[in-house]
């Protein structure tokens, strides 16, 4: 990722190419792939299958999640700007993975347990964007609260048949865009 940013900056500096660099953080929403290895699709998939939720590590690591419509709005504003340095687009509201697992259980109305497994090597303890530039330069902040976005996301996946749920991609998203 850093190499790509360096190449982009070089094209801007040496060739005058109009560029934008966006750093996105944990985007989620309807139509995401349930098998992509990230925590939201993993928890939703496990909940829908009636499986216990798997937390890697002790669950104290934190993440922040940005609903897809907020992410798109931030990227759009960056594209309309003339700012060529990196800008973080994400929601800085953090939650521990353990607390998030409990939120998913509450959201789904199920009785699954949370099970803990060894933390993968190099898994960050915190992933929270500093969105100061997005606020100052783009006038952007995330608007959709995690609870609201997760409800929309869960309801989308809950509405799918088992066959649709098993698909790699989900094409119909018209009713989930604000």
Which residue stretches match the model-derived regions?
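Short-chain dehydrogenase/reductase
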Residues: 1-5, 37-38, 65, 94
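Active-site Tyr-X1-5-Lys
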Residues: 1-20, 48-49
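Flexible, glycine-rich beta-alpha linker
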Residues: 17-38
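C-terminal substrate-binding subdomain of Rossmann-fold SDR/epimerase-dehydratase oxidoreductases
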Residues: 26, 47-178
């Amino acid at each position: 990722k850093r190499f790509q940013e360096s190449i982009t900056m070089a094209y801007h500096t040496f060739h005058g190419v109009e560029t934008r660099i966006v750093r996105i953080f944990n985007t989620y929403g309807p139509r995401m792939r349930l098998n992509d290895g990230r925590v939201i699709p993993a928890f939703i998939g496990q909940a829908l299958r009636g499986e216990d939720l798997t937390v890697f590590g002790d669950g104290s690591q934190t993440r922040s999640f940005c609903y897809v419509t907020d992410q798109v709005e931030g990227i759009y504003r960056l594209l309309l700007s003339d700012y060529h340095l990196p800008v973080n687009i994400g929601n800085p509201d953090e939650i521990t993975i353990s607390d998030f697992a409990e939120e998913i259980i509450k959201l789904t109305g199920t009785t699954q347990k949370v099970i803990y497994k060894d933390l993968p090597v190099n898994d960050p303890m915190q992933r929270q964007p500093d969105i100061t530039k997005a606020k100052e330069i783009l006038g952007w902040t995330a608007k959709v609260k995690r609870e609201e976005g997760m409800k929309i996301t869960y309801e989308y996946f809950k509405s799918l048949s088992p066959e649709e749920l098993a698909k790699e991609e989900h094409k119909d998203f018209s009713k989930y865009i604000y």
